[in-house]
Amino acid sequence: MQKFRKEDPTFRVHRDEESNETIISGMGELHLEVYIERMAREFGVEVQAGAPQVAYRETIGAAAPYDYTHKKQTGGSGQFAKAVGTMTPFTATEDDEDKNYKFNNKIVGGRIPKEYIPAVDKGFQEAMSKGTLIGAPIVGVQMDLEDGAYHDVDSSEMAFRICAIAAFRQAYEKASPTALEPLMALEVSAPEEFQGNVMGQINQRRGIISGTTTQEGFVTVNAEVPLSEMFGYSGDLRSATQGKGEFTMEFSRYNACPRNVQEELVKEYQKQKAEEAK
C-alpha cells in the first residue's frame, strides 16, 4: 500500500486503532476497487473489504456561549480550570491558514495565565475531531475565549485542555449542529438515445443537473450528486446505456444533508454508540 501511495497521492491509508482495521480512502468506489484488485493480482494478498464509507462532516448553524468549570479533587493536588466564551460559525478567507477552525484569545488582565492558553486551543481542536451529532469531524467553527479562572496550585495544562473539550461540547449542543455530506461533480457521456435514462438515474440519486451538451450523436450531462448515492453507479449506468455510457467523478464540495438523511445518520450513530457501550 505504501507503493500505491507513492504512485497516487489521492490514495490514502491509515490504521483505525479502535476497530483494528486498515482504512483506505480515495476518489470513489471504482478507484478503491482497482487497488483492491491490484493487491490480489500483484502481491497475492487476499483483501476482505467492508462496505465503502462516506466521509461526512459536522458543522454549526448558530452561535452559542460556553461557561464551563472543570473541578476535580483527589488526594493531594486537584484539577481546576474555567473557560468562558462564544462558539460561532466560521467561513475562512484566503488569509486563513486553517480553513476549518479559528481560535481567538480575548483574555485580558491575566484571567487565564498565558502558559495555559495553548492548552485551551488544543482542547477545542481535540473536541472537533469527533462531533456528537453523527461522530464525524467538525468543520467551520470559531472559538472565542473571553474569560476564565485558574487556581495557583490546582490549575495545569491538562486541566485547561480537559475544560476546553467539555466547554466546546457544551456550546456545540446549543449551536444547531448539522451534518454535511460530500457532493461530487459528475460528468456522464452516452449516445443521445440514452439521454432520458442517464438524466433519470441522476435525478433518482438526488443529483442536480447543471447542464447538457450534444456532439456527434453523444450527450454529455454535468451534475452534482451526493457521494452516498453513487455506490453501484457504474453497473447501473452500463445497464441503462447498453454498456455505452462512461462517467468521471471528482469531489466538489460539502453541503448540508437533507433532514431525512441527517435523521438516518443520527439514528445509525446512536445505534453504534449503544452497541459499543455493551
PLM-predicted stretches and their roles:
Residues 1-278:
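Accessory interaction regions appended to the cores of large information-processing enzymes
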